[in-house]
């Protein structure tokens, strides 16, 4: 990568970060965080329930506000950054996408499991019809090979996505894993199609993996203030920017404003520290969807189990995003096994 190439900085504090506090951002908190990010000159600010448009539900957890209330609050203060949102086909609809567009969203990341890009077609095509920028977002990218992942990205590109993401939802990718996936993308995607990296910090590799991605030609990097996100969080934005600064990379943001926002605004909101610990490390080790953390901890407390045991079993069963309802089933299975062993 040349030093002159501008890295697109995509903040996810107000979407992925929502997982860390069970989707309970107040409208005022969303407004305050967005204003701080905008003043620090990030390129985009993603806003939604942690599980995307219409994610507020029994399965994922109910948000303190609707997506539109959060989006409108952010739109009222943002002057520079593009307002972005996330949509999972089958949860969010084209009607939700249109409403988000009318509220101020200009970029949508259409997210599917890493082997299911074909379900993104309707939403990517509709976003382009609205005049939005459509981005393909391949979750749990560690669960398929680099070549197969690139083929899925190619599908999204064919539907109209102008950028395709490697999404390490489980925080399970190593640096060579990231390198291999971006090289596979480069081999198959059009030169004009951008690529992005969405890292999680469960193995403490969020920043390192993002750096490797940029070294391999990645155009966009997701990160969040104080790492606010599911599991051990995303790549901490202020840390990535500091590292990029030392490497002489062009990121276009104000490091000190990001540091202040991380410590003064975001970190105090964490009711559970966003960090690598026993449970979040288990996510990366077992390759489990990072947003399963809080659900698994709740199930463990309810049934007198260890959250780590639940998470490792979820990894063995290769559970993916959207199967949150199975966490209780796994807990009950473990409880039955424990009771049988004690007889």
From Swiss-Prot:
It catalyses: (S)-4-hydroxy-2-oxopentanoate = acetaldehyde + pyruvate. Mn(2+) binds at residues 16, 198, 200. The active site is at 19 (proton acceptor). PROSITE patterns: PYR_CT. Its EC number is 4.1.3.39. One of its GO terms (biological process) is L-leucine biosynthetic process. NCBIfam families: 4OH_2_O_val_ald (TIGR03217), PRK08195.1 (NF006049). This is 4-hydroxy-2-oxovalerate aldolase 1.
